[in-house]
């Protein structure tokens, strides 16, 4: 059957090796009916792995196309076991069949021992490795036997010596980590067993593919982590990189000395790690089990600038250049100082957002100066339909009366100064008809390259038959004479011919050129592309790409296009050249490509002018992108204008236009920037050679010197180190907002791309870049002397002001004090209690002295407006710690100690030793003077937490207005101060980790680069923080005093470049100018909206809600006050579902464990739940394990100051400690010593040291006050509560389930709850996750005896739920239906109000509802009350 094997191999295209030609196929069987095939393959000799694999895969692929089922039986007559071949077979089985771990990188070939009888031993060097291999060995044995290795037996053995040597460690740790820790050493230092191992030194790239098990690697630490297990064993993890690759290393240990070693290793330290390569159990990712680790010196030599006279970089980009620069201001300044450079110029792209950080880093540094500038995008105001400015004498030329030469040229390249003309084609048009055609080739001086031939189809033979250049130009000149030139992208053709005419002494005067490309942009601004073929397609002109790029063909196509364009102009009433010349629109400008110039501020006045230019280009001149008109840039003695870098108009003209254009362009600038030749490397494979670039740069320097311009060499750096180039390339290849592309991005992926290395260069490195000039004196001049000359003209500039500038408004300093005392007298009596008088004066004095009164006064006016319109206002932040804020009506939180006050006779009683720090927890009590019930108030909050210990901190007054009222308040602020002085607080959106990861993965795939996950993690970490776009604070409004312009502080822009926005935002992130200008935080919140609805539905004013109520406090720990048990609501232990700030799973769990009993306890819960490391592993442990209560633990930042003062700690130290702890800075040893002296317990001190962030008590109190009120309505007005909840607090419903019985609803909840934690295809969708809380609330409502009806076509509202008291149920609105939306819901209600719906047909006609929603309405039974059609009404 050898012949059948040969035939079969031909069929499957398998080349049979000589030694396998005796192979036979036996017992073939084919069952066509069952689509089954089987056979036996008998190998005489043992097949080599690669041959077997190829045969096996090709056989399988072939049979898969013929039958559904197949069975192959392999036999090998002469079996020979060779270790290297067996290793390959095992690797393949693991990768292709077992698919559970990377076997080939898991063990070394030395771990295999092969016996001739087929027994093969695999040695595992740890219990961990043994467990990993076990399942695979069993699988591999069966697979190898099926391949014909009949007696194959792979046996696993364990290196017992290693296990014995490590046994002491194994017995000392918790059982759950025994497996991993069994092979660990006693410390990071060498153990006895370690000394017996030979660790192979590898690079991190080699590590990825090595077959070695014990390795030694070197890298820089970029991530470290310590995990403490339940058994107190610690897992030390580090990630290291050598900038080519990365890996992770870890160690299990319980030893203190290991902790010390690990603590000594910091991020950016270089280390040498020795250990064993292992795989993670779940992910099977490689890591090194650390046996030894030690810090070493960095093997990478620091670059130094050793020149005596040093250069200055005048064109640096930072992270604030959108999707371009990758360095922070700190990175840039540190490197500049390392080089001992005296200054750098920061020129971000249409942005000055990095200025504040540069200012803060360097303003007080006398030896270093930042030059503040900007790379500005510019375009011409001219529409450039006429390539050169149209002279007045041609203005009245009639379009249809002229003769036109519609032409195209082909060239050897893109540069009129460097390349040659090889073909000309033209059609002459008169009165809309072609009267002449011309076509000829021109002989070039150099041989035609293959690229040009491939693009155009023109060969060297074509050109040999052409005209000499001089003759050709004279012929072209005669064709153009007294006619108008027309070309597509005419600037290229026009300038190319113009340069050739001038070079050959042929007159080129008053040649008028029309560009059909720009004409198309004006006439058809909606086209996505304006290439000749695209425009032809849009105008239905025939265009064949296979013939295109020939002058004769392209000119004939363009002729037909231009005839149609003239017709369109006539239809639009455009008849004269001057009318054509003046055509423009914002859409047209949005299609224009901008070029970049440099602008530098020379002094403080120049900074403001720069800010104004920045504002203008981001607002007034924003045409799809920032593009300022060249013509509108005013020259100033306070600014320097540079020619720009790689993407500048000057470089564009140098490479793609005429010498005359270049000379005219040079005249526009104060100094000429010459980019480093290496920055043009991306041109080398597509447009220009390195030599051509250098020739042109030499010309530019020569011409600029002839015009006595200051010439400076620039590097345009984006990064400091060579390895960072890959990060810049990632951004070059990533799309920004609205799919914007980087200027260096090359669309043609079939070309090799050599992106420039835009590293920050030393003086010597830059001199080397310009060595092609062969003139040391000239090189010194442009690299060192002239940049320093520019720097010497620049003053040290202050970017951020050093004090607060508040608006003068409404005599606020007088009116605020008056209002505060009037309200104090009204509440506490004319003779104010001493404690209140002192507190008012303590606050008012600094508020008035520092000019903070206007902030209070404006806030008070806005709150009163909201209240007068029926909307409550909640306070945020620490404003509630100010009694002045309370008395001016800004906040409801009273910061005084717990006290009683009589609203009738002003009896005042400060409670001694109150049960809690909240006055709301005081028992009800009658006035001893007039027998009226006393009001109770006071939350014990020190004023220092708001304005600082010296009361000089700029106040943040954050207010929660109703979400539906927020816009009106914003407009009110604008009305009060004017649109030129009110701006939304700007933010900067940068690339987050998840987005950076996506960029990197896409780039690596595109570039066919393969890096480990660890190196991707490293790149991700280093790629974050780059600017993507701008944004705005959700409620922050900046107010600029009338006597200033906004540019005295910051430029402005539209948020996220939305030119339709009614507000502009500060260009600087608002934090940068926080201490300079007034910021109001006017936020939108659900609570005021919900409470207004509850007041309306119940008639109960929130002011009348009791401050102490047993039922209300009880629902935070039990549902009993709601009339239900926990069992009735799926085991929920509290009644807090749906209560703002307390209804989340996390907080409800806190409630069930901490069991709050008072209002003060609720404030503590609010503080704990909003802090970081305040509850988890901190207060939670203290309450559960140490038996402390909520009032004893630290929950809010203010607690620390209050508690410490009570213990006798000095007030200033108490304040300092509070500030440190709330910011996560812990305590100093001296502070701990003093606290112990004052009797502060250890658990309290340890608790403070764990805290990373703390919530202000005033904010927590304001939240709890709102929650308390909502809880009141939930307890006493259930239907009103649920109607409000569904109307205001959720947008996600499953109304079909919600309107069914409780059993069905509970079943759905259980299903979703089960799937909530799944991580497979059955996990919850985003909508289901968001709907689940709504279903829990609906279930609770049903448990209380209430129901939800179906949507009622005659009654339901658009958005609000209706209460049906008679049936104890709610009627849902239309907007709960998926896909319907508020607009359509309102349209249904409006149509119904006009006239009752007669039928489904009538409903559809009047609402415009789509068929999908109609079917949804029908399936839900909403149309049951009306007939299908109108016919019944016509009878």
Swiss-Prot record:
Location(s), subcellular: Cytoplasm
Source species, domain of life: Bacteria
Catalytic reaction equation(s): DNA(n) + a 2'-deoxyribonucleoside 5'-triphosphate = DNA(n+1) + diphosphate
Single GO biological process annotation from the record: DNA-templated DNA replication
UniProt-listed Enzyme Commission number(s): 2.7.7.7
Keyword Protein transport assigned: no
Domain Exonuclease: 404-562
Pfam family name, one: DNA_pol3_finger
CDD domains named among the record's database cross-references: DEDDh (cd06127), polC_OBF (cd04484)
Function: Required for replicative DNA synthesis. This DNA polymerase also exhibits 3' to 5' exonuclease activity.
This protein's name: DNA polymerase III PolC-type
Organism: Mycoplasmopsis pulmonis (strain UAB CTIP) (Mycoplasma pulmonis)
